Regions:
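Helix-start (N-cap) detector for alpha-helical repeat units in TPR-like alpha-solenoids
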Residues: 3-4, 38-39, 72-73, 106-107
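Structural signature of tandem alpha-helical TPR/SEL1-like repeats
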Residues: 16-29, 50-63, 84-97, 119-131
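Mid-chain, well-packed structural core segment of small domains
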Residues: 66-86
């Protein structure tokens, strides 16, 4: 357990310092060694996103959401990755899921409203955002 914390925490520190390349290396190792660590996958996905590796970010964040499906933060970040990858419909569903889990999650609400306003034809007229 201590090894897990040290390994994942090291990757998180590197990420927060903006050293995304090193963070990816540490977090990839942590995610292989500790496949049940949602934190390793969340930060790995975020580091990939910072590198512009949006498909890799989606994969890591999807794994994080499988481990911890009730996290609105993970669904919001997954929505951000889908949006950056040019997959707005999936982004919309992830933002919506984040709001279902936490109706007061302002970032997810703002992202959902923004996406809905920018892409009305793609998303269809039946999509509603609760006020």
């Amino acid at each position: 357990m201590t090894e897990h914390i040290t390994n994942v925490e090291q990757g998180i520190v590197l990420f927060k310092e903006g050293n995304f390349e090193q963070a990816v290396g540490i977090l990839e190792d942590a995610s292989r060694r500790f496949p049940g660590s949602y934190e390793a996958f969340v930060y790995l996905g975020a580091a990939y996103a910072q590198q512009g590796r949006h498909n890799a970010a989606i994969g890591a964040l999807k794994r994080a959401s499988e481990i911890k499906p009730d996290s609105p933060r993970i669904h919001y970040n997954l929505g951000q990755a889908y949006e950056a990858a040019g997959v707005p419909r999936e982004a919309w569903f992830e933002y919506k899921k984040a709001l279902e889990l936490d109706p007061k999650y302002g970032l997810a609400r703002g992202a959902l409203i923004n996406l809905s306003q920018r892409l009305p034809r793609l998303l269809g007229s039946t999509i509603e955002v609760a006020a």
